[in-house]
Amino acid sequence: MLFWNRKKENLIIQCSNCEWQPDGEIHWACSCGHRWNTFKTKGKCPSCKKQWENTWCPGCGKSTPHKDWYKTKEEVEKIETTGDLVLRRKKKSLESRLIDYGIKNYRVSHLEYLDHSKEKFQTAYDAGCRMIILYAIAYLVHNLDERPSFIDWFKTEKIWEKVSPKEMEFLMNPSPEERMLMDLSWCIEGAITLAWCLKKVDVLPRLDDENNVVEEFQQNLPELGDSLILFLSQSEFRNFEEIYEENLLNELATTYFRDLLFNGKKDTTRINRSVSYERHKVLNWLRTYYEEGGEVTGELWDETDTST
């Protein structure tokens, strides 16, 4: 049955690729320049009368035949019970969190994207080393005179090789620039994120919440300057499924903010962009694959890719 012959009240409008459903906003523009809600006219431009065969989806960025957007309740239910139901649950969880933050039009079109079992993560030991380094750097931004003693500490604890070249530059620069200090001050967010991954912080604060967990973080870590051997050797991860979802959440938030630069639209969230970026970076580092047996050196931190 053709979509226009179906009873309107029985139809659900939904992208065939990512399952995004129209939100009542105007997302479409005709080649004549007219902007309108394409579903109010079944894909036909009210201005120039051009009939569009395909419709672009704001959720996944793909164009599919306009007629395929119209589905019955039964067809939607069949879609929702098809494929890997575990990954479907993850899709719903991630997209619900995005919507809750105000990122309403970003959807996952490939369920495989949500499968953390295909990822290879850093060891808990290396994650602990990176957490301590980030914590120390954030502290030293406000205590520059203590840098020489911290260099000695890093070497004594045998984690100096895990300090990145940019971090070493800061540690040995007599007069670091203000911009460098400002950038490095955000390292505390990466450290807290890794602490959450390592079960040293119970809950990560929301990206739009000014509350922090620094006190809990500090209580569950060794004092800066103390021995790290026992602490690092006993580090262990929380469920990788939780870690991976947090990574994807911040990856999609980065995509959202990047897209704002190009589409000129207003930010509809209250997300702290700097916090989200630091989480995105440190979690991307955590799930970066390195050859088995290879040493995780500091250079790898500076090379962390946050492109989307």
Language-model regions, residue ranges each:
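Short metal-binding segments enriched for Cys and/or His
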Residues: 40-74
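Residue-level marker of regulatory loop/turn positions in helix-turn-helix DNA-binding domains and
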Residues: 7, 22, 37, 49, ...
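Cys/His-rich microdomains that often coordinate metals
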Residues: 19-23, 34-37, 52-53, 64
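Short cysteine-rich clusters marking metal-coordination/redox-active sites
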Residues: 15-18, 29-30, 45, 57-60
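Extended, charge-rich alpha-helical interface modules
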Residues: 77-308
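Short, intrinsically disordered terminal segments enriched in charged and Pro/Gly residues
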Residues: 1-17, 21, 61-82
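Residues immediately within or flanking Cys/His clusters that coordinate Zn2+
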Residues: 10-12, 25-29, 35, 42, ...
